[in-house]
Amino acid sequence: MKNGEVFQYDKRDSQGTHVTPVSCEAFDFVRYAEYEESLKERQKEFLEADEGILVYRRVRADGVFYDKCRDWKESLELQLGALQKSLEYQADIANFLEPWYGIGYIAGCFGGEYEFLDGQAPAVRPMFHSTEELLAAAPEKIENTPAGRQILEMTEYFMDRTKGKLPVSLTDVQSPINM
């Protein structure tokens, strides 16, 4: 940034796409399965080749990677809307669901707590001021932290609601250096 400029933390995700939320009952699981199946031969050829390119066009529902992560139902329905929208595009890899709940869950293992600014992704205030402080800290198991439990329960919710018919990724894996 140039001298005097301020980071615009209130700007939304430039990759976010406006989508219409879709309930599990209204989502076309058959169409998605057919789309995903139609890509497998190309993926197999890519994996067996010495070189090549696969095109991945992620349709990210606006808000899911911000404040919409707090409401599992809303996040899932927005992501289902994004999956449905993604079927309109030629790609080599099908889109998937992501039970995203911020990138601060590793910080949560060290006692960090999420802070939600209006309309923004969850944040964690800096906790360590040196590498020595970080190395001396004793982390908690992720399943024993509020953010960790939220992610695990949200993943289970996504799997239950879709009956395991859609791919669900791990949440966004981050480094403890983010603390």
Pin down the residues of each PLM region.
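Catalytic cores of TIM-barrel enzymes
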Residues: 1-179
